Amino acid sequence: MAPEQREGASQVSVTFEDVAVLFTRDEWKKLDLSQRSLYREVMLENYSNLASMAGFLFTKPKVISLLQQGEDPWQVEKEGPRYFSLGLKCSHRTTKSTQTQDSSFQELIVRKSKRTFAFEPLNMKSENLFIHEGKLEEKWDKNTLTVERSHKNNEFSPKSHREKRSSECKKQISYLSNPPGITPDKRYKCSMCEKTFINTSSLRKHEKNHSGEKLFKCKECSKAFSQSSALIQHQITHTGEKPYVCKECGKAFTLSTSLYKHLRTHTVEKSYRCKECGKSFGQRSGLFIHQKIHARENPHRYNPGRKASASLSGCQRAHSRKKTYLCNECGNTFKSSSSLRYHQRIHTGEKPFRCSECGRAFSQSASLIQHERIHTGEKPYRCGECGKGFTSISRLNRHRIIHTGEKLYNCNECGKALSSHSTLIIHERIHTGEKPCKCKVCGKAFRQSSALIQHQRMHTGERPYKCNECGKTFRCNSSLSNHQRIHTGEKPYQCIECGMSFGQSSALIQHRRIHTGEKPFKCNTCGKTFRQSSSRIAHQRIHTGEKPYECNTCGKLFNYRSSLTNHYKIHVDEDP
């Protein structure tokens, strides 16, 4: 450091307050989820860095405890912030920069995170130091431990000075980051599995996998996580927030990785090319599936795995190494062996997770947890518009369409708009007549798997859905929901024409036909039309002569249940 630059420096102790940003309750409410996520990352990282530098025990600040537990950090106002001093000497650069009241959140966080720290081990000589914004470097003075905190100041750091120090920085970082005898990949080793990490914070995060320690708990569903970033990502499932928006089409996503995959649908980029025929693919899994065609044609000469690797550039291979576990059945790749094992259960049909209440089995533990909520009645996912609760995030997302009216997928046959691609596929089977889900017992086929599962309960006698009020059991959840409205008196389905309310959506659909005059059910014999399917079935008995309703008293037969009910009154009147 030049003498003229040293003159404005002063020595003070570093406290947690120096690297902390605190918000009032009102300020915290104004932050969106991405801003809160950034705040948590900066605060926890700063605390971790200071704690590792201190070398002795100290009281954990309340704001850090709140952040680790997933609580709102403004609650710390009740006690007042408590800070600890590391007892380190801090060189304050002379600065004229001030923090204005109208500074944006991003500027505030970046300003705090730019207060960087640098160390160098004892007996290492390093006369100069180039401060990196937002980076942590180690520098120890020969006799005293110093922490240099840089401020954004044009007078202190003119452009010429930055350029001059730039080349020096590159040399020093290589030396400071990698002291003699210590390789960058083997600084911090896990005692359990001997995996190595380049810094202590990464090692601590990894060790939580062995200890099972999960400090970050969701307030909505009580699910716990070992890392704050995982909790933040999980909380999005409750709020339904989708902060990652595609600039091309406006579609929103909960994860940045989902947005990245989606963006490739807009570009013509197809970076995975088959060397055999030249065909290109946007995703590596697509290339693997395609290469199986060539592998079947010439299995001795062609190796799908090797070809996939050879067809990528050096940079692409570096990215592709992240997914090293390949499914031999379908060609999909996965980041971990556990993810591959979960996936392979789709092909093997293995379902190791069984419900203790009804005996139903699942391939994944998450599916079992979601299913168990049917028995417990737990509904952790709540709609922000109407307050209605749901057992899964997918059901909540389907419900939200009622409020937003968003329907993105149109049927080419009838023009009907649907909210999801999977719903569109099931709907299209109405037009094609396709029924891929077949019952192995009686051979009856269905358009969707959920209908088949409900049907199979007729053969097994299984009725897993029980009413807590009267104990009556049902084969499907929707039947239970409809039944429970008898006890509650709830009628959520209202006709917009006359205001009449109904307990079931099917009853509302039938009622609307009174206003529209629609009669979609036609008799194939005489051409007469009906508003309800049951009315057509009853009418067709006139042509077939079928009389399924028999009087237990006199044995007389009837076409309609209502006719049998009226007939019973004759016997009631005859009784003395």
Swiss-Prot record:
<protein>
    <recommendedName>
        <fullName>Zinc finger protein 354A</fullName>
    </recommendedName>
</protein>
<dbReference type="GO" id="GO:0001822">
    <property type="term" value="P:kidney development"/>
</dbReference>
<feature type="short sequence motif" description="Nuclear localization signal">
    <location>
        <begin position="170"/>
        <end position="189"/>
    </location>
</feature>
<feature type="zinc finger region" description="C2H2-type 9">
    <location>
        <begin position="437"/>
        <end position="459"/>
    </location>
</feature>
<dbReference type="GO" id="GO:0007000">
    <property type="term" value="P:nucleolus organization"/>
</dbReference>
<dbReference type="GO" id="GO:0008270">
    <property type="term" value="F:zinc ion binding"/>
</dbReference>
<dbReference type="GO" id="GO:0000122">
    <property type="term" value="P:negative regulation of transcription by RNA polymerase II"/>
</dbReference>
<keyword id="KW-1017">Isopeptide bond</keyword>
<keyword id="KW-0238">DNA-binding</keyword>
<feature type="zinc finger region" description="C2H2-type 4">
    <location>
        <begin position="272"/>
        <end position="294"/>
    </location>
</feature>
<feature type="zinc finger region" description="C2H2-type 13">
    <location>
        <begin position="549"/>
        <end position="571"/>
    </location>
</feature>
<feature type="zinc finger region" description="C2H2-type 6">
    <location>
        <begin position="353"/>
        <end position="375"/>
    </location>
</feature>
<keyword id="KW-0539">Nucleus</keyword>
<dbReference type="GO" id="GO:0006357">
    <property type="term" value="P:regulation of transcription by RNA polymerase II"/>
</dbReference>
<feature type="zinc finger region" description="C2H2-type 10">
    <location>
        <begin position="465"/>
        <end position="487"/>
    </location>
</feature>
<dbReference type="GO" id="GO:0051593">
    <property type="term" value="P:response to folic acid"/>
</dbReference>
<feature type="zinc finger region" description="C2H2-type 12">
    <location>
        <begin position="521"/>
        <end position="543"/>
    </location>
</feature>
<keyword id="KW-0479">Metal-binding</keyword>
<dbReference type="GO" id="GO:0000978">
    <property type="term" value="F:RNA polymerase II cis-regulatory region sequence-specific DNA binding"/>
</dbReference>
<dbReference type="GO" id="GO:0000981">
    <property type="term" value="F:DNA-binding transcription factor activity, RNA polymerase II-specific"/>
</dbReference>
<dbReference type="InterPro" id="IPR001909">
    <property type="entry name" value="KRAB"/>
</dbReference>
<feature type="cross-link" description="Glycyl lysine isopeptide (Lys-Gly) (interchain with G-Cter in SUMO2)">
    <location>
        <position position="125"/>
    </location>
</feature>
<keyword id="KW-0832">Ubl conjugation</keyword>
<feature type="zinc finger region" description="C2H2-type 5">
    <location>
        <begin position="325"/>
        <end position="347"/>
    </location>
</feature>
<dbReference type="GO" id="GO:0001666">
    <property type="term" value="P:response to hypoxia"/>
</dbReference>
<feature type="cross-link" description="Glycyl lysine isopeptide (Lys-Gly) (interchain with G-Cter in SUMO2)">
    <location>
        <position position="242"/>
    </location>
</feature>
<dbReference type="Pfam" id="PF00096">
    <property type="entry name" value="zf-C2H2"/>
</dbReference>
<keyword id="KW-0863">Zinc-finger</keyword>
<feature type="zinc finger region" description="C2H2-type 1">
    <location>
        <begin position="188"/>
        <end position="210"/>
    </location>
</feature>
<comment type="similarity">
    <text>Belongs to the krueppel C2H2-type zinc-finger protein family.</text>
</comment>
<keyword id="KW-0010">Activator</keyword>
<dbReference type="GO" id="GO:0003700">
    <property type="term" value="F:DNA-binding transcription factor activity"/>
</dbReference>
<feature type="zinc finger region" description="C2H2-type 11">
    <location>
        <begin position="493"/>
        <end position="515"/>
    </location>
</feature>
<keyword id="KW-0677">Repeat</keyword>
<feature type="domain" description="KRAB">
    <location>
        <begin position="14"/>
        <end position="86"/>
    </location>
</feature>
<dbReference type="Pfam" id="PF01352">
    <property type="entry name" value="KRAB"/>
</dbReference>
<feature type="cross-link" description="Glycyl lysine isopeptide (Lys-Gly) (interchain with G-Cter in SUMO2)">
    <location>
        <position position="159"/>
    </location>
</feature>
<dbReference type="GO" id="GO:0005634">
    <property type="term" value="C:nucleus"/>
</dbReference>
<dbReference type="InterPro" id="IPR036051">
    <property type="entry name" value="KRAB_dom_sf"/>
</dbReference>
<feature type="zinc finger region" description="C2H2-type 3">
    <location>
        <begin position="244"/>
        <end position="266"/>
    </location>
</feature>
<keyword id="KW-0217">Developmental protein</keyword>
<keyword id="KW-0805">Transcription regulation</keyword>
